[in-house]
Design a protein with these regions (language model features):
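MFS-fold secondary transporters
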Residues: 88-93, 108, 124, 181
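Helix-loop junctions at membrane interfaces in 12-TM secondary transporters
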Residues: 94-105, 162
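C-terminal membrane-cytosol helix-exit motif in multi-pass small-molecule transporters
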Residues: 171-190, 205-217, 231-246
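Cytoplasmic helix-loop-helix junction between adjacent transmembrane helices
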Residues: 106-141
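12-transmembrane solute porter fold
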Residues: 7-34, 40-66, 70, 75-78, ...
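Membrane-interface helix caps and helix-loop-helix hairpins in membrane proteins
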Residues: 98, 189-194, 215-222
């Protein structure tokens, strides 16, 4: 579907706002962990699943979301996923114990995983090749700024409000996006029937879930933790073997045969791992061990968030002007 310039700008704004809200949500609970550990009487290893579980589900859902994009109309899929995010946020807002909160976080992650892939694919589809770097730079600004701003925003909010307000913020932000999409988002493409490899989805979810659960358990029960990690790796290996032999893989691992793609993938994984690890650990250390307030933690996290916001669009412009080698 051919869109005029004004429509493209409006659609891009809606997509970026949705992706930003989903990514902001990934680290929004980090600063709230000490408060929730106190309120629910739980350990750090259990509380961190509010963030780790969210990231895990996003990672597992993302490959499926590319197929969902092809199978359903863009408008229906976007409204469904943003609606799911709002419903999950409402569940977290009214919850009064840990397990409904965790369920809300995991449902938010399902919606976020779909929204993030949807936004990237749709942006590339409506963008001309000569503006690709700039648009991807804006998307990367959202990808990096969302998780970076999350702890800052939650730190400020928790200075005056309870952790319930974090879910309330998610409801309000995504409700605005949903309303804007109802009136402005066209069907960029028609739906078409394709098969989805659900067994591969289950293998990846079980494998990564067991591996991460093993890491969380190994300190308290070493034998159980190591066993879970080994079992998780076996499921992941089974998943990888299935992808190599499948004609329509859920995740096309054959791309890793390319040396450049392989190196860049490893680099992005390491960089994002360090980024998320730092975003998770620093608030817990400052609040639980150094006795700092949520607002003080927010101030510590602020410079990194600002740097991300500034650097990402500049990188996209440099890519358009000078190419990949300069970057």
């Amino acid at each position: 579907m051919e869109l005029n310039r004004t429509t493209r700008l409006v659609v891009a704004a809606v997509l970026l706002a949705a992706a930003f809200t989903g990514l902001l949500n990934q680290t929004l609970m980090v600063t709230a962990m000490p408060m929730m550990m106190h309120d629910f009487g739980i350990s750090l290893s259990l509380a961190q699943w509010l963030t780790t579980g969210n990231v895990l589900v996003v990672g597992v859902v993302t490959p499926v979301s590319a197929m969902l994009y092809e199978r359903f109309s863009t408008r229906a899929l976007f409204l469904w996923s943003t609606g799911l995010f709002i419903a999950a946020s409402v569940l977290g807002f009214v919850a009064d114990n840990f397990w409904p909160v965790l369920a809300a976080r995991l449902l938010q992650a399902v919606a976020s995983g779909i929204i993030m892939s949807f936004a990237q694919i749709a942006l590339l589809r409506i963008t001309s090749p000569r503006r690709m770097g700039t648009v991807l730079g804006l998307y990367m600004m959202v990808v990096s700024a969302g998780p970076a701003i999350g702890p800052v925003m939650s730190g400020v909010m928790l200075e005056y409000l309870s952790w319930h307000a974090l879910f309330g913020a998610g409801v309000l932000m995504m409700a605005v996006v949903f309303a804007a999409a109802v009136f402005t988002l066209p069907n960029i493409k028609a739906a078409r029937k394709i098969a989805i490899d659900w067994p591969s989805f289950v293998l990846s979810f079980v494998g990564m879930g067991l591996f991460l659960a093993g890491i969380s358990t190994v300190q308290e029960a070493p034998l159980v933790g190591v066993s879970m990690m080994v079992a998780g790796l076996l499921f992941v290996a089974w998943f990888a073997r299935r992808q190599w032999s499948s004609a329509q893989p859920l995740l096309n691992l054959r791309l890793l045969k390319g040396a450049t793609f392989r190196r860049m993938t490893v680099g992005v994984m390491l960089a994002f791992g360090v980024f998320l690890g730092t975003e998770t650990i620093i608030p817990v250390l400052l609040e639980s061990h150094a006795g700092r307030s949520g607002f003080a933690t927010a101030l510590v996290m602020l410079p990194g968030a600002v740097s991300n916001v500034i650097a990402s669009p500049l990188t996209g412009r440099v890519f358009d002007a000078r190419g990949l080698c300069t970057i």
